[in-house]
From Swiss-Prot:
HAMAP family: Ribosomal_bL33. Gene3D superfamilies: Ribosomal protein L33. This is Large ribosomal subunit protein bL33. Keywords: Ribonucleoprotein, Ribosomal protein. Pfam families: Ribosomal_L33. One of its GO terms (molecular function) is structural constituent of ribosome. InterPro entries: Ribosomal_bL33, Ribosomal_bL33_CS, Ribosomal_bL33_sf, Ribosomal_zn-bd. GO terms for cellular component: cytosolic large ribosomal subunit. Coiled coil: none annotated. GO terms for biological process: translation. Transmembrane segments: none annotated. The keyword Ribonucleoprotein applies. It comes from Alcanivorax borkumensis (strain ATCC 700651 / DSM 11573 / NCIMB 13689 / SK2).
Length: 55
């Protein structure tokens, strides 16, 4: 049986606070890196979050 299609990813804050969210995405349908605006509680603002690998 094949492995899971959805892979776990980490969304890291571009504000440099070290805050991150974890989520999953379908690598086959969306091979590009994910980028979205989310709330960063450290700076108390919405900032861009970029995809990074989970170590």
């Amino acid at each position: 049986m094949a492995g899971p299609i959805r892979e776990k990813i980490r969304l890291v804050s571009s504000a440099g606070t070290g805050h991150f969210y974890t989520t999953t995405k379908n690598k086959r349908l969306h091979p590009e890196k994910m980028e979205t605006k989310k709330y960063d509680p450290v700076v108390r603002k919405h900032v861009a979050y970029k995809e990074a690998k989970i170590k």
